[in-house]
Design a protein with these regions (language model features):
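N-terminal signal peptide c-region/cleavage motif recognized by signal peptidases
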Residues: 17-19
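Soluble metallo-hydrolase cores and metallopeptidase-like ectodomains found primarily
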Residues: 27-30, 107-114, 123-152, 158, ...
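Acidic/histidine-rich catalytic neighborhood of metal-dependent amide-processing enzymes
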Residues: 174, 234-237, 244, 248, ...
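Active-site-adjacent substrate-binding region
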Residues: 217-233, 239, 246, 250-251, ...
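N-terminal capping segment at the start of a domain
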Residues: 26-62, 271-273, 349, 428-434, ...
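Noncatalytic luminal/extracellular "stalk/propeptide" segments of secretory-pathway proteins
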Residues: 24-29, 49, 53-220
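Bacterial N-terminal signal peptides that target proteins for export
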Residues: 1-11
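Second-shell loop/turn segments in exported
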Residues: 31-39, 53-63, 119, 130-156, ...
């Protein structure tokens, strides 16, 4: 190669190392202090035990959530944070907490059933016994076809369900488990993840005219091609169908409902919601997910014309009216640029089948630990570092969306607040308890050199992958929606997607201590660097205003 003149070498080197905005130097001594504090003096598993063992699960606005939130506030104050408080974000819905439940087959034989109630269903305060019947009802993702299926179900079963327990859905043998349930990313998988994804044209147009794929893999690929406003429309439309179904079953005098879920097998149940938390919406009958093996047994006995009777009990603590929900906020004040912010967070709420350890007690425990580390080391930081632990994430990013709208801007109008200019970036953790392997740039390629520098001290621990890709389903999207830098870290899968996600196995024992220690060290380093970076972090162009969910889907 022909030698380059010295002046050109210098200019070329400048372009290689200087991103859009000056970048702070990574001090190996500071990183080493962070690692020692994170690995040798860790409290992350203690935090997780309180959040999951003592207070879990943490359904939004439930007594358990509120007790856990008070614990987090006290712990952050103990660590010396400032401005620690519960910040209300609005009216959520009814507080709902299951106090006791049982589901049993009592005829033709006795058998206790492995079942979990779905949130915001109705109670059976005294045990109820009745006949169980199968009423086939297919799970459909196309909202129009889902409405048609509900209409057909009404016509077929109206007047036939009173005083009965119903099995809502046809039995199906669970798929064979041919792949490992616990995995870590391989080098090849990370290399593939680092590549830019295949570009897909966005499907704009009339929501009602979209053609939705029926196969689940094709459906989720199609869903990723939709703008966020259309995804919101889809979600609201399906919720309307579910609420209407619950109303029909209640009006028909159904005693209770058993449902089949493809994830519920091998002794594990998965549970989300049967209805809406809003007090204005109808309350469906007591509704339970039953493991596939037991669900299928019940259906086979009924198919053989042998009557089946079940006994159900469900004691609930439910508020009579809609209640307010809170986020948990705390700060380490900055110095030279104290009016500017770096934020970290993760959702604090969980579903209720397990104890919410990996979703997302782990992320919350890590973020509390990050603040402890930064405060314990008395690291000087120019910008204020703020932690936010969100509620309402599992019901649609409600807590973070409300916070962003209040403090930074409204994605539906793109009217921005003065604080919008003061937030440098937001870093989120919510993909289970796996160690950090890198970060999603969320199409903000100007951030690549920053993360390359900040993650370099953790290359030997596997944090090597920086991908231009987006990732969804969690609270960084609320910031991204108004043009703020928001990032979610790449984490090893472990058994998050196969076993623990929203399941009865989402417990402390499925968290890996060394992985959470590593995550704490990585994020503490990233936050320290971002807080002391000479300039604000680079941003993407502001997005256009996002249409509100259409009136037909509200």
């Amino acid at each position: 190669m022909k030698p380059m003149p010295l002046c050109k070498q210098i200019v070329a080197l400048m372009f290689l190392v200087i991103p859009a905005g000056a970048q702070s130097h990574v001090d190996p001594g500071i990183v080493q202090r962070i690692k020692v504090e994170a690995y040798d003096h860790s409290k992350v598993m203690e935090h997780l035990s309180y959040l999951s063992d003592v207070y879990g699960p943490r359904l939004t606005a439930s007594p358990e959530f509120n007790q856990a939130a008070e614990w987090a506030v006290e712990r952050l104050r103990e660590y010396g944070l400032a401005n620690v408080h519960l910040e209300p974000w609005g009216t959520f819905g009814r507080s709902w907490s299951a106090r006791q439940w049982s589901v049993e087959m009592v005829e033709p034989r006795y058998a206790p059933l492995n079942a979990t109630p779905l949130a915001w269903c109705g109670a059976a305060e005294n045990p109820i016994t009745g006949e169980l019947i199968v009423t086939p009802y297919k799970r459909i993702f196309d909202p129009r076809k889902a409405r048609e299926a509900l209409d057909a179900y009404r016509k077929e079963w109206a007047g036939k369900l009173r005083g009965k327990f119903v099995m809502l859905g046809e039995p199906k043998v669970p798929d064979e488990q041919t792949k490992p349930q616990f995995t870590r990313y391989t080098d090849a998988e990370l290399a593939d993840l680092a590549k830019a994804p295949e570009h897909m044209a966005k499907n704009y147009g009339n929501f009602e005219e979209l053609k939705w794929p029926e196969e689940i893999e094709d459906f989720f690929k199609f869903l990723s091609s939709l703008p966020e406003s259309t995804v919101d429309d889809w979600w609201h439309a399906l919720q309307k169908v579910n609420i209407a179904r619950g109303q029909f079953l209640r009006d028909e005098g159904v005693l209770g409902v058993l449902v089949w879920d493809p994830r519920a097998h091998d002794g594990t149940t998965n549970a989300e919601a049967a209805g809406s938390p809003k007090s204005a919406d109808p309350v469906p009958p007591p509704t339970f997910v039953v493991t596939a093996e037991q669900y299928n047994r019940l259906a086979r006995v009924i198919e053989r014309k042998v009557p089946v009777r079940v006994r159900v009990s469900l004691k609930l603590e439910v508020s009579a009216t809609d209640v307010e929900a809170n986020n948990i906020i705390g700060e380490i004040p900055g110095t030279a640029k104290k009016d500017e912010l770096v934020m970290i967070g993760g959702h604090f709420d969980s579903w209720h089948a397990g104890t919410g350890a990996t979703d997302n007690g782990a992320g919350s425990a890590v973020m509390i630990e990050v603040m402890r580390i930064l405060k314990a080391l008395s690291l000087p930081m120019d910008r204020t570092v703020r932690i936010a632990l969100w509620s309402g994430e599992e019901q649609g990013l409600l807590g973070s969306e409300a916070y962003v709208k209040k403090h930074f801007g409204d994605p539906h109008s793109m009217r921005l607040t003065p604080e919008h200019a003061q937030l440098s970036g937001y870093f989120n953790l919510d993909n289970g308890s796996g160690k950090i392997r890198g970060v999603y740039l969320q199409e903000n390629d100007a951030m690549r050199p920053f993360f390359e520098s900040w993650l370099a001290p953790f290359r030997d621990e596997g944090a090597t992958t920086i991908t231009i890709r987006n990732t969804g389903g969690t609270d960084h999207l609320s910031f991204d929606a108004v043009g703020l830098p928001g990032f979610q870290f790449i984490q090893d899968p472990l058994d998050y997607g196969t076993v623990t996600h929203h399941s009865s196995m989402d417990t402390y024992d499925h968290a890996i201590p060394s992985d959470l220690m590593e995550a704490s060290a990585v994020i503490a380093t990233v936050v320290y660097q971002a807080a002391n970076n000479p300039d604000m972090l680079p941003r993407k162009e502001l997005p256009p205003a996002r249409p509100a969910a259409s009136s037909s889907t509200q």
